[in-house]
Amino acid sequence: MKPNILFIFADQHRHNIMGCAGHPIVQTPHLDAIADEGVRFTKTWCQSPICQPSRASVITGRYPHELDVISNDGGFNPDWPTVMKQLQGAGYETATIGKTHYHESYQPPKDGGKIDMRSQEGFVQSFGWDYVLEEYDKYLHASSRLTTPYTEYLAQHGRLDDYRAQIKSAFRLTPEHWRGQTSVLPQELDLSSFLADQTDQWLRQRSTDKPFMLKLAFVQPHVPLIADPVWSEYYANANIDVPPLDPPEATTPGWEKYLAVLSNHSQTQMMDHDFVEAGIRQYLGMVSLVDQKIGEVLATLKELGQLDNTWIVYTSDHGEMLGEHKLWAKMNFYNGSVQVPLIIRPPGGAPARTEDALVELTDVTATLADIGGAKPPEGCHGQSVLAAVEKPIEGREFLFSRIGNFAGMRNTSHRLTMNLRDETPCELFNMNNDPGELVNLVNENASKDLVNDLGARLKAHLTD
């Protein structure tokens, strides 16, 4: 029988906020255990540092500019070849539980209108999912005009009004959006707990002998920065390392304008040491809860006798800046934003490996197909990285990412950012000598040839 696939997809998980990645404080014993029995990749880029383009790229293995999805404005096409459709054709039952973010209605309901999340299930299924249970970002739950499986669950427990009141206080892009808070809900009613419970039920109620490809898509640790009471208390007195709050250098007028957008998004006027420290505490708590719930799902698989026949793949759509360079969230090409965790564990486990080759999330697309004995979807640019479980791989020469009219790329030594409107380079960092990306070399005379070479390669990528 073909192996099962558990594809765990977090939202906005920064690449180094795991014990196995060397973080000195965060508690992630289950992710660490997966890494101890598999391979952890240290240089994985998402194809866009924002939700929808990244997710479009993951399911197709194609780049955002090819799909015409370069921002969070929708545009997903059910006719796209996807890895889920390929796996269905290879005999798999496919299921997604959590956030997909495929459709344009993934926005707050307009005045007078209502949205029931379940009305979108047919659209999501058309991408190759047999079973769909979808949820929204927490901040969209603030609207009383929105109904989701989770809001109904909270209503049944008499806690929906309490929850909505707190989420409204931290509604998107206000200063409170980034203020660390403790949830008014007990841990067992948290959204991550709900999604893990739904996953447990799905696994136990399956009535087919087909192998499964199950995507468990957590909504956390995406903002708002609200952790459950248990983990919030755990990190309350932890010694938090707050990064220097120095803003990026505005090297060109176009880049200066975009940095102003990022600054406004991050509400930088609120960003002093204590404010950022409080936010990081809650972020660590959300990561630890996701890890805890992963452990519960793995325990269910073990109880059902399925763990030793299941590949586990863990990653995220993009990262989180956590105050670094005086920014929150993503939407830029700093490592904190564009690099994501990637861990792959084979059935039964394998000796732990760390893989430093350059890898993209398009490679995850090809890898999922490879696990299931299927061909990658048509147009997929990914390369399967299954071989990395056993030995070093060559990896890629270049990595690419794009959001709107800005694009980033890197090779083994340098990272470049370019404004596509006027084709001007904005950033160049030496990733080996300056891993903190503190010294922008883009306007140095000694960098001119390298900037031109990388810029030409980036333009060629975008026009191929």
Where are the regions that the model predicts?
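Short, well-ordered alpha-helical segments
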Residues: 429
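Formylglycine-dependent sulfatase
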Residues: 1-420, 424-426, 435-456, 460-463
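Residues forming the ATP-binding cleft of Hanks-type serine/threonine protein kinase domains
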Residues: 432
